[in-house]
Structures are given as structure tokens and as C-alpha cells.
């Protein structure tokens, strides 16, 4: 395995761990991580979590974005933020869906 591939694997493992911790710290419910790399051409990993209300969903997404931005990790796209019934955060090879 090339050094770059090892680095990317370590980075993705650290990112998955960080996202799971942030979701747990923000009291997200029903947290599931799904490996879809062999089933999707769009992404490799999907996190799915739920909040108790639209306010909670928005707070979870806000905290996730804020904490990851501190490590210079910014979402490529955000969907559903205005209504906050569900919010999709696109981090390229990793998606986070909070509903």
C-alpha cells in the first residue's frame, strides 16, 4: 500500500470516529454508520442519525459542521438546512444525514 493510501485510510478512520463522537455528544439518536462503497458511486460511508425535534436536528448539524471546521474539514454541500426536518452534510466520501 502506498503512503498516500495509508494516510487516506487513517484520515477516514479518524473522521468516522470524530463524527460518531460528535453525534453522540450532541445526543443524536439511532446513530448508524453504513458502508456503501460497493453499492454507491456517490459516497463510501453514510452516517444516519435522528434528533428529537427540528431544533435538535439543526443543533446536531451545526455542532458537527463547527467542530469539523476547526480541523479544516468543511462540507462540500448541505441540503435541507432551511426546514431542518432532515439535513444532509456532504463530505465527499462520507455523508451525514440527520433527521
Which stretches of residues belong to each language-model region?
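Short hydrophobic/aromatic beta-strand micro-patches
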Residues: 48-50
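Catalytic metal-binding acidic patch
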Residues: 44-46
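Short glycine-rich anion-binding loops that position phosphate/pyrophosphate groups of nucleotides
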Residues: 52-53, 94
Amino acid at each position: 500500500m502506498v503512503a498516500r493510501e495509508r494516510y487516506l485510510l487513517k484520515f477516514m478512520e479518524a473522521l468516522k470516529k470524530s463524527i460518531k463522537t460528535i453525534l453522540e455528544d450532541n445526543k443524536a439518536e439511532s446513530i448508524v454508520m453504513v458502508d456503501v462503497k460497493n453499492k454507491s458511486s456517490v459516497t463510501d460511508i453514510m452516517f444516519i442519525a435522528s434528533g428529537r425535534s427540528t431544533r435538535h436536528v439543526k443543533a446536531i448539524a451545526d455542532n458537527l459542521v463547527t467542530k469539523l471546521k476547526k480541523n479544516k474539514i468543511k462540507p462540500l454541500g448541505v441540503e435541507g438546512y432551511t426546514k431542518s426536518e432532515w439535513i444532509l452534510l456532504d463530505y465527499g466520501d462520507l455523508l451525514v444525514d440527520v433527521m
